[in-house]
Amino acid sequence: MNSALAAGLQIGFVILALAIAYVPLGDYMARVFTGPHSLRASGLSTIKHSRVERLIYRVGRVDPETEQTWVGYTLSLLGFSFASVIFLYVLQRIQGVLPLSGGLGAVSPAVAFNTAVSFVTNTNWQSYTPETTMSNLTQMVGLAVQNFVSAAVGLTVAVALIRGVVRTTSGGELGNFWVDLVRGSLRILLPLSFAVALILLSQGTIQSVYTHFEATALDGTAQHIALAPVASQEAIKEIGTNGGGILGANSAHPFENPTPLSNVIEILAILIIPVCLTRTYSTMVGDKRQGLTVLSVMGTLFGGMLALVTWAESSPRGIAAQAAGAMMEGKEVRFGIPGSALFAVSTTGTSTGAVDAAHDSFTAAGGGALILNMLLGEIAPGGVGTGLYGILVLAIIAVFVGGLLVGRTPEFLGKKIGRRQITMAALSVLVMPALVLVGTGISVALSTTTGYQGNSGDPGTPSSIHGFSEVLYAYASAANNNGSAFGGLTVTSHWFQASLGMAMLLGRFLPIIFTLALAGSLATQRKTPASAGTLHTHGPMFAGLHTGTVLLVAALTFFPALALGPIAEAVL
């Protein structure tokens, strides 16, 4: 099949499926978080809890009818997350004496710390080989569970911010974190994951509690083939925008992603919740135009990145690439350029980080676009929850800039954006660039770093430039809770394990704290009626301002770093 036709069919299928799911799934998620009798972000008294939910609240000694201010909401979220880090760390350290160990011993302290932080922060950065490091019990009880709850945590923050925009309560209550966490996990993530797992099973994705299978090759030698409960974890890996593979090759492995159809299904699973959350936002604020405007910004950025990556990888350079007809190094033949490019842009535009191709083998322009996709803040369309609250924070900054241009006090959906609000929004946006640039700068300054780079050499050579891009990609991935990597960089040293672990922690929880503080301050305000001079946050004009703000922030912050890495590599 012609490559352009294949690309068009895949993109068309994904867009059609998202369009079909947009209204029903978006409205359903709004009902999950606002109760069955009202789509307004009102109190929790209208929510009907299921028996399973009531049992969980009873065991956890949680009063589901009690609401929390932003401080209480934040403390609950942080307490739950850090308890999860400790549990997952201990589980890895004692897995050798637990059932289903498969003969695997305890995970080393550095790897256990990095992995615990990685999965709790929804990053799923993997500095280990899953088949030879993690037991099936650790995968199922530890990592798979975190795939659900870490995604649900992102959902809770997005919903809390929407409530902050909508509500006008004197106490600034944002809801109940525990209720939002449980309902997001049980009513959204679990059903969708079950459906996707069944589809993947039909395509040949494996599901086994056995650790390995012994086969005999054609030459008579024995072959040790790793097995695992792949389908169940593969589904939530994509639905929850997690990305950590149960097998080392991730979604390039035929046991995880066997066919072109399964590849498209996984792409759809990655995008469906972040895209449909814009409808949830529309429904909860009572204005359908708001979500469509946000979606148009996401779609513009996503489409631009997809066009750039597809063009870069479809333009053969060199004799081997010209013979193949495209830049096929590091890509699976069963997916080709269209499937690999669409998957790569989807996984870096969200916080997923799953891969069906080797990103390190992409061209300088293609790989640079993937880095930039993360450096935009992963808002096109972003991770589960994280993409929505990230792009709404940038919308508030765009409103502030627009207000300054017209000489009016900035307002966002009737709420004034004053010094406290813009400070919280700015701090939320500045965390990631600080972590990326500081982490990259220190790492390349260390003399030991070159020993861990697959590409190094004299300064200014293509190899050394690509080595810099590998380090930049690593910290962009960690700080944005993405988890993908340029595989040429070895990250098993204590420095990378610790520094990337801290980048994941701070990159996840500092923006959450600032976003919830912003939501709390907005919730206490009364709405100001719109007037003739109000800057409306819907329509093409604001969409353009919003998109321009996103690109301007990224360009001013990261252009020097990109010029030293992928841009320099592309022009050499």
From Swiss-Prot:
Write the lineage as a comma-separated list. Bacteria, Bacillati, Actinomycetota, Actinomycetes, Mycobacteriales
Which Gene Ontology CC terms are recorded?
plasma membrane
NCBIfam families under this entry?
kdpA
Record text on subunit structure and interactions: The system is composed of three essential subunits: KdpA, KdpB and KdpC.
> What HAMAP family does the entry give?
KdpA
What's a single GO MF annotation on this record? P-type potassium transmembrane transporter activity
Q: Where in the cell is it found?
A: Cell membrane
Provide the protein name. Potassium-transporting ATPase potassium-binding subunit
Topology versus the membrane, per the UniProt entry? Multi-pass membrane protein
Membrane spanning residue stretches: 5-25, 71-91, 97-117, 142-162, 188-208, 258-278, 292-312, 387-407, 422-442, 500-520, 548-568
Q: Does the keyword Transport apply?
A: yes
So which domain of life are we looking at? Bacteria
